[in-house]
Amino acid sequence: MSCQAFTSADTFIPLNSDASATLPLIMHHSAAECLPVSNHATNVMSTATGLHYSVPSCHYGNQPSTYGVMAGSLTPCLYKFPDHTLSHGFPPIHQPLLAEDPTAADFKQELRRKSKLVEEPIDMDSPEIRELEKFANEFKVRRIKLGYTQTNVGEALAAVHGSEFSQTTICRFENLQLSFKNACKLKAILSKWLEEAEQVGALYNEKVGANERKRKRRTTISIAAKDALERHFGEQNKPSSQEIMRMAEELNLEKEVVRVWFCNRRQREKRVKTSLNQSLFSISKEHLECR
């Protein structure tokens, strides 16, 4: 079947010599009524009935580019409106708007699935709960042993992990007042902090112990040794190094102990003399005032 060009508003004549099966076409509605287009397109279409021009190849079947309605049937229209008559008509619809994005659909489905999930209740006798209780008690004991308060721990963690840690957080953890999920997260953080705190404490104790070892213990001198040293002091209050060594060997004492004893004895003798002189001066002054 070939295309037809219209010579009037109501009938079409075949372009070729094939005269078999002329299809009369009755336009019950004007072209302007077939499609809701703009005024400009309506004017163009209203004047198109009096024009004679060739039309591109016809579209049959279910081709989406055919327009118009056949009288009493669903046979497609035998002509196509020029493209310029539809320039102000409906804009083309993009394919993404016609079909939903599968990624977005999957996301919505996943969101609905997660919203339906209900957290299973925690068994209070489970090994996880017992381990958490044991760690909370051990943490409290070790924290107190190291000399840290809950405030100290909260401030130390806040300086590293943020302001969500405070004394209240540590208190609630030790009293098992946090949710199981938050308590498990805090357990890992507190465990690491406790290890570091104990390492620092061990280094501090080692340093203090070294300083204490440097300080010598106080030596106790027997009464007989003190009497012998007093006799030597009466003879010579500033003995030489050889004399100090000889006295240390005789009294079975260390040389440094004997040297320090003589130094202390001279200081005490000096204080006694100073105090005695001050007393004598006061007595003399009072005696003169009485006269």
Swiss-Prot record:
Changing S179R: In CPHD1; transactivation capacity of this mutant is markedly decreased on the GH1; PRL, TSHB and POU1F1 genes; abolishes the functional interaction of POU1F1 on the PRL promoter with the coactivator CREBBP but not with the transcription factor LHX3; displays normal nuclear accumulation but a markedly decreased binding to a DNA response element. The 9aaTAD motif is a transactivation domain present in a large number of yeast and animal transcription factors. SMART domains: HOX, POU. This is Pituitary-specific positive transcription factor 1. Changing P239S: In CPHD1; loss of function. It is linked to Pituitary hormone deficiency, combined, 1: Combined pituitary hormone deficiency is defined as the impaired production of growth hormone and one or more of the other five anterior pituitary hormones. CPHD1 is characterized by pleiotropic deficiencies of growth hormone, prolactin and thyroid-stimulating hormone, while the production of adrenocorticotropic hormone, luteinizing hormone, and follicle-stimulating hormone are preserved. The keyword tRNA processing does not apply. It comes from the Eukaryota. One of its GO terms (cellular component) is nucleus. It holds the Pfam family Pou. Residues 124-198 form the POU-specific domain. Changing L74A: No effect on the interaction with ELK1, LHX3 and PITX1. A motif (9aaTAD) lies at residues 5-13. Signal peptide: none annotated.
